[in-house]
A protein has these predicted regions:
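Charged, low-complexity intrinsically disordered terminal segments
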Residues: 2-144, 154-162, 171-475
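Lumenal/extracellular "mature" regions of secretory-pathway glycan-modifying transferases
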Residues: 147-149
Length: 475
């Protein structure tokens, strides 16, 4: 027996050992997420679509924020209005121009005694915050705490897939914003020529401390995330001269903000800016850093099954087996479903675009009408419209990562007026889209302007269509 071991060891070169270790590492990276979990029976039994509708005016009002300039303006205004506490959750936070605007506003709020808590996903948190003088300057302010959700570590490959994808801003437990925008100039303001267009909601509580109100639900959700052992403190251990210079720069930037965005620093009439709602509810995925039960997808599908017509916005479509089955069930129940997603030529996510090229016939086969939007900018919107009352807006992409791996949030808003506003935008976007007709030929909206892909991009997607096949459930 000893002789056999010796022969095996003799044939194990350094290269072979490294290859074995690499295979083991890749296995640890993907194996925990290979099998999709099921929705627990208790959750299925307790879920009632009718519970998301109200019988009359509720305690919360809503505003719809559909452009990047307004998105920055709202954030600056709300942060300025805070008197007790600010909570910010974001998937990506960059110290670019828009990011520094938000950091400067948060720092000034802390200077006037407001408690500030920020949580950032651990992938972008490690890459963007580590050693960054602007974030170090912010966290060194009294009353400011920053945590990183599940920081990426090469020594824990089984955790790398689980990401925090939530984006919301809570002010004094009385109002908040929630949607799909990250904290960077790609989504906020007019700093960059490249933009992603997104939608989000502002919610304002008219009756203080209604524990059933959505703001209470969002706050409880945040506290659960914040208390997780995997939410690690981000600290400034030593305030260097570089950090002190960044602090000075940010304080000066606050003066620039007040001069440049004067409207943000005036009194706003929230009642005039918002719409009456019957009910607002929070839908979420599990928060643990592991393979997740698809609670949010199940909730959306159950709500869609009760509708006659469904319009969905998603930046890209990456369906797993269970998601295909869910779409087929909608078709078999007579629910008319349409999706608005990016045309491959305008999409910002190469993984999603590539998978759509591979899977589009199968998606069309479920009976879903897919509108391929050719907008001026790439769409990052995640929304679902059910008939003429219910609108769902948030961070959930129609893909397997949002379904099984990431934390995700969607607000379910029973508000006919909001539904009407978003539907009008959807009709405009459909006019700038193309759709596959029953005759197998594309039909083009009047506003669709073709955009030819470069030869390099075509070659890139040709290669990617092969490479993504074994990886698609992790895209």
């Amino acid at each position: 027996m000893t002789g056999k071991k010796g022969v095996i060891l003799q044939h194990l070169t350094v290269g072979k050992i490294l290859l074995i270790l690499l295979i083991i590492y890749i296995g640890l990276l993907i194996f925990p997420y290979v099998c999709h979990k099921k929705v627990p029976a208790a959750y299925r039994d307790s879920f009632s679509p009718s519970a998301f509708y109200g019988s009359g005016p509720g305690p919360e009002r809503v505003a719809y924020i559909d452009n990047n300039n307004d998105a920055l303006l709202w954030r600056l205004h709300l942060i300025e209005e805070a008197r007790e506490e600010i909570i910010l959750s974001t998937f990506d936070f960059k110290s670019d121009e828009a990011g520094k605007d938000i950091i400067a506003a948060l720092m000034q709020a802390a200077d006037r005694g407001v408690q500030v808590r920020v949580i950032v996903d651990g992938f972008n948190g490690v890459l963007k915050l580590t050693g960054n003088k602007y974030f170090k300057a912010l966290v060194s302010c009294p009353g400011v705490s920053i945590r990183i959700y599940n920081p990426i570590s090469p020594f824990r490959p089984w955790d790398l897939q689980a990401r925090l994808h939530d984006k919301y801003l809570i002010i004094d437990e009385s109002m908040y914003m929630l949607g799909g925008r990250n904290t960077m100039e790609l989504f906020l303001g007019d700093y960059s020529e490249q933009k992603n267009m997104d939608r989000e909601l502002f919610v304002y509580e008219t009756e203080k401390r209604d524990e059933t109100a959505s703001i209470s639900q969002v706050k409880r959700y945040f506290e659960t995330i914040w208390a997780l052992p995997d939410s690690r403190e981000y600290v400034c251990r030593k305030k260097t001269s570089s950090i002190e210079q960044a602090e000075k720069e940010l304080k000066e930037r606050y003066g620039y903000l007040k001069e440049t965005y004067q409207e943000a620093y005036t009194d706003w009439d929230y009642t005039a800016l918002t719409m009456e709602t019957n009910k607002i509810s929070l839908l979420s995925n599990p928060v643990e850093t592991e393979n997740k039960e698809p609670l949010l997808w199940y909730s959306l599908q159950q709500l869609m099954l009760e509708a006659d017509q469904v319009t969905m916005y998603t930046p890209y479509i990456i369906c797993g087996k269970e998601m295909y089955q869910g779409l087929e069930e909608l078709r078999d129940r007579g629910v008319s479903v349409e999706m608005i997603t990016n045309d491959v030529a305008s999409g910002a996510n190469p993984w999603g675009c590539t998978d759509y090229l591979n899977q589009k016939e199968k998606i069309w086969g479920t009976g879903v009408k897919v509108y391929e939007l050719m907008g001026e900018y790439s769409s990052h919107t995640k929304a679902v419209l059910l008939d003429d009352r219910m609108s769902l807006v948030g961070s959930y992409n129609f893909d397997m990562r949002s379904t099984y791996q990431d934390t995700e949030l969607m607000l379910a808003v029973d508000c006919p007026e909001l539904n009407s506003v978003i539907r009008k935008e959807a009709e405009q976007d459909k006019n700038s889209s193309r759709i596959m007709g029953e005759d197998g030929e594309y039909q083009y909206g009047e506003g669709y302007v073709p955009r030819e892909m470069s030869i390099g991009k075509k070659l890139f997607y040709s290669l990617m269509r092969v490479l993504v096949i074994p990886l698609r459930r992790f895209l």
